[in-house]
Design a protein with these regions (language model features):
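His/Asp/Glu-enriched, well-ordered alpha-helical/loop segment
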Residues: 230-246, 263-275, 281-369, 373-376
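Metal-dependent enolase-superfamily TIM-barrel catalytic cores that perform enediolate-based chemistry
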Residues: 107-129, 136-197
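N-terminal metal-binding scaffold of metallo-dependent hydrolase/deaminase domains
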Residues: 1-38, 386
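Active-site gating loops and adjacent loop-to-helix segments of metal-dependent hydrolytic enzymes
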Residues: 81-92, 135-161, 204-244, 284-318
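Active-site core of metal-dependent hydrolases
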Residues: 159-285
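Conserved, mostly hydrophobic/aromatic
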Residues: 48, 128, 183, 213, ...
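Divalent metal-dependent hydrolysis catalytic cores, especially in the metallo-beta-lactamase
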Residues: 61, 77-106, 121-134, 161-172, ...
Length: 392
């Protein structure tokens, strides 16, 4: 079947364009042509809305009562379905620090869910957020389960789970540089996270294969003072080196001025938005479990903010990707109005994560790309979602 999208503001790599027809055949974008030349087919009239590539979430733990570490098929399928309704068409399920048996159950469920995932955001491999972190920056992770990134700890994971596309680790812990080199050799993303490292150590990590900073600013060292001297941390290394930067643009983790600074200093081609969304996403305030239901840690949600039980820090987010784009667009546009910031905010939610994940057919409206297409208005209220040319 041929789909023909018309009447929209098309978010193309070269900018926002109107008066076009986007033609979809066999699940892929076949052509983008003047609307007057549109072929016969099922028309999708955007009615003046934005026509955008589907959003790509590189860092998401679940939602709607499920955590991927629950180790069930439904723990993957239901969040995939629900996140898709908010514009996410591709996601990399993320596993927080856990026991190795919990990892085994979670990956087995991922494999079982893959062929069944026909109505949700497509899976793009697994992100291990842990267990190779600094205890000083464990945050909402289970510090009792942290391990050193030594070959005897990471090789069993890499050899058993070819689905791994990214591992987040603290570069200052013993063995981290070797882990970075091994991940780079295997084509797996090595990311700096939950770290108390100095700027110098993070710059060394960059030379040893680390290319991404996980939830920038969060559980991450920055300028500190010892005696009368000041020392730069991981945040400063993120600016000084060509790291890609991941931010949780939910309006809670980072204020607008920091979002603007990240955007201006790194640019939309180096910044990726992520939800870091957890089990409580889509649910009311209350008490929940982070990680597997059997072995996870308790956390609370108050006024839509996920917190550790002592309320001393955040515990992930309950955001969806449409909220990220809306928040970032508003932050970077300022007085120009939210809609003015949408093109670059969308780039940070589409083309940039597609490049980082190595998905050349995702994240762009261009001939040959997958027909993962969403429609939304000037407030980023998503109205229609197509994955592989099929509406969900």
């Amino acid at each position: 079947m041929t789909l023909v999208f018309t009447g929209g503001r098309f978010l193309l790599p070269e900018g926002v364009r109107t008066g076009l027809a986007l033609v979809v055949r066999d699940g892929r974008i076949d052509a983008i042509i003047p609307e007057a030349d549109a072929p016969e087919g099922l028309r999708v009239d955007a009615g003046g809305q934005f026509v955008s590539p589907g959003f790509i979430d590189m860092h998401v733990h679940g939602g709607w009562g499920h955590d991927f570490l629950d180790g069930t098929v439904e723990a993957y399928l239901e969040p995939a379905r629900q996140h898709a309704l908010h514009g996410t068409t591709t996601m990399a399920p993320s596993l927080a620090t856990a026991s190795y048996p919990d990892y085994e159950r979670a990956v087995r469920a991922y494999r079982e869910a893959l062929p069944l995932n026909v109505s949700g955001a497509r899976f793009a491999g697994i992100h291990f957020e842990g267990p190779f972190f600094s205890a000083a920056k464990a945050g909402a992770q289970d510090a009792a389960l942290l391990k050193l990134p030594l070959p005897e700890n990471y090789l069993p994971l890499l050899e058993a789970y070819p689905e791994i596309v990214r591992i987040s680790a603290a570069p200052e812990v013993e063995g981290a540089m070797g882990l970075g080199e091994e991940l780079q050799r295997r084509g797996i993303i090595a990311a700096v996270a939950h770290t108390d490292a100095s700027c110098a150590v993070c710059e060394e990590a960059f030379r040893h294969g680390y290319s991404l900073m996980t939830h920038f600013y969060c559980a991450m060292s920055t300028v500190s003072k010892r005696g009368y001297s000041r020392y730069a941390g991981a945040v400063e290394a993120g600016y000084l080196q060509d790291f890609d930067i991941e931010v949780i643009a939910d309006g809670v983790h980072l204020p607008d001025d920091l979002l603007r600074m990240v955007y201006r200093l790194k640019g939309p081609d180096r910044v990726v938005l992520c939800t870091d969304s957890i089990r409580a996403t889509g649910l009311p305030d209350g008490e929940y479990i982070q990680g597997s239901l059997e072995n996870g840690l308790k956390f609370i949600v108050e006024n839509g903010v996920a917190l550790r039980p002592d309320r001393g820090g955040l515990a992930g987010s309950v955001a969806t990707t449409d909220r990220l784009v809306r928040t970032m667009a508003r932050a970077i546009a300022g007085s120009a109005g939210l809609a003015a910031g949408i093109p670059d905010a969308v780039r940070m939610m589409t083309a940039t994560p597609a490049r980082i994940l190595g998905l050349p057919a995702k994240g762009r409206l261009a001939p040959g790309c997958d027909a993962d297409i969403i429609l939304f208005d000037d407030t980023v209220a998503v109205s229609r979602v197509f994955i592989g040319g099929k509406e969900i």
